Curated annotation (Swiss-Prot):
Major localization class: cytoplasm
Its biological purpose: Involved in the biosynthesis of the central metabolite phospho-alpha-D-ribosyl-1-pyrophosphate (PRPP) via the transfer of pyrophosphoryl group from ATP to 1-hydroxyl of ribose-5-phosphate (Rib-5-P).
Protein name: Putative ribose-phosphate pyrophosphokinase 2
Keyword Ubl conjugation annotated: no
Catalytic reactions on record: D-ribose 5-phosphate + ATP = 5-phospho-alpha-D-ribose 1-diphosphate + AMP + H(+)
Gene3D superfamilies assigned to the protein according to its UniProt record, in alphabetical order: 3.40.50.2020
UniProt GO MF annotations: ATP binding; kinase activity; magnesium ion binding; ribose phosphate diphosphokinase activity
Binding site for Mg(2+): 136
Amino acid sequence: MTERYADKQIKLFSLTSNLPIAEKIAKAAGIPLGKMSSRQFSDGEIMINIEETVRGDDIYIIQSTSFPVNDNLWELLIMIDACKRASANTVNIVLPYFGYSRQDRVAKPREPITAKLVANMLTKAGIDRVVTLDLHAVQVQGFFDIPVDNLFTVPLFAERYSKLGLSGSDVVVVSPKNSGIKRARSLAEYLDSPIAIIDYAQDDSEREQGYIIGDVSGKKAILIDDILNTGKTFAEAAKILERSGATDTYAVASHGLFAGGAAEVLETAPIKEIIVTDSVKTKNRVPENVTYLSASDLIAEAIIRIHERRPLSPLFSYQPKGKNNA
């Protein structure tokens, strides 16, 4: 069992979106979750009560702003306000999944940049720091005027696949869209494997007509993306890989939302295993071939390093021989 962390000035609180990962983070850090309650009135209003003193403490609030996105975001904002009014020393938020991060630019005329709006709201509420996991767009860090620590899951995935023997020239890491090339290359470098990209014509209404840049024939393919939402991107990419001669297809994503009937879509796709982290707690049905890989140890280590003013850089690399990164 993890020993109790000695510094009592640091406190962790979990809101309601993803209690399981919060409990794992607390256990890994050796810090018990603080006592608080959150309830919703019949008209939808949220009431929060912090049931212990936080005066002078460094607070870390754990909350994924996943479905229901707006309820979870407002619960977070209200908790931040409660901590500020209770004279906390610092208020830091831990977002295993950062909702609205996909709305990071104006793609069509008169569209908002909602990721920036959310950043403004959180900053105005009084937070001192953000710890998050695999932002959809890394430039969202620049929407904040406070420190943002964007942790990467690729080292976790690399360790998993290395243990499974999925590495080397017999494996190809595939980005199912051209915007994910950097992510695919990062995993491929860890695995010492080549990369491939699935691209589509400008009109991609028939997405199964995509073509592959790179060689996948006779290789085991690993599809990688940051968010698994409806599952269509992975399902369509897996069919293209199968037609192109890939022997087996695996898929990995940082955040498993499994929305809009994703289980049904993915269960008919030629994918051997799907790996996601536990950044999102979903009530939707999950395919039987899904494996959850916990990001709790990574987040817990980041929290402790931040509190102790130690560098986070060792967390951004994978040491296959278990070297000590301290």
